Amino acid sequence: MNCSKIIPPILRLPAKTFALGVLSLSAFADAAIEEIIVTSDFRDTALLETPASVTVFDSVVIAQRQARHLEQVLNLAPNVNFSSGASRGRFIQIRGIGERSQFIEPLNPSVGTLVDGIDFTGIAGAATTMDIQQIEILRGPQGTLYGANALAGLINLRSNQPTEQPQGNMQISLGDYDTRTVSAALGGPVNDSLGYRVAMQKHSSDGYMVNDFLNRDDTNDIDELSLRTILDWQANQQLDFKLILFHVDADNGYDAFSLDNTRHTLSDTPGHDRHKATAMAVESRWQDAEN
């Protein structure tokens, strides 16, 4: 008689498992999933609706990687590779197509690089991640929108835009090899129709190479300054204008080769990788009043 009241443990396990499953589904249902918007198609499109193979990295991923340059994020994307040939990765390949160096064909970049709509194709050394909101990597031909420079794909960097409320941040970081980074950004409204955002970043490092011939440890150094200003003018309810000013000044060393593949070199005349660029862009958008 007593044996008939004993419930085997195996009968209780499915009930507990089912209860846990219900709780998990409920938790997922309550959690809001943020929608990712892609801007590379000249219009804001949800990632799931974009007719291309796209990888998007937001500011959270960039911060987690402590990335100061595009090259420090590219290796997270599938089917994307890059080579340096200088202090920074500037030759990018998507699905095996693209420049490998400045001396090997094809000399056509094939992979477009845009920073806030400004074309830096072939000179991706200027693509710092200063105040970047997200990085979009489009795999496959994008020639219809961007021409011959995007036959293999496109990399689009979009910075943080002016906000309706005052907003700012500042970061100071220190690291090994005398690495120092100072960055700051400030934005907000000027009046009801005009907004602004300014950002700067100064990044320097001695590098991890030691030149035994010259008895120096800074021949592969990094010294980069980036500045950006965005003015956003809402002319009326349908028409919007943006003025984008961008400046980058890089004076980096280049002393990376050694016969025994160590961090020690014997170069008597180390190289330099200097890059200075100033760019401006004007962007306008019209939105139909019915939308």
Where are these regions (language model features)?
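N-terminal periplasmic "start-of-domain" segments of outer-membrane beta-barrel proteins
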Residues: 34-65, 73, 90-93, 110-111
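Transmembrane beta-barrel wall of Gram-negative outer-membrane proteins
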Residues: 167-169, 174-205, 209-252, 278
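N-terminal periplasmic accessory domains that precede
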Residues: 70-71, 91-93, 114, 137, ...
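Short acidic/polar hinge/loop motifs at secondary-structure boundaries
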Residues: 102-103, 110-141
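Transmembrane beta-barrel architecture of outer-membrane proteins
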Residues: 65, 89, 110, 152, ...
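Extracytoplasmic loops and strand-loop junctions of Gram-negative outer membrane beta-barrel proteins
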Residues: 137-138, 166-169, 210-215, 262-268
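Non-catalytic regulatory/gating segments with a bias toward low-complexity or hydrophobic composition
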Residues: 54, 62, 74, 135-140, ...
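Extracytoplasmic beta-strand/coil segments of soluble accessory domains associated
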Residues: 71, 75-118
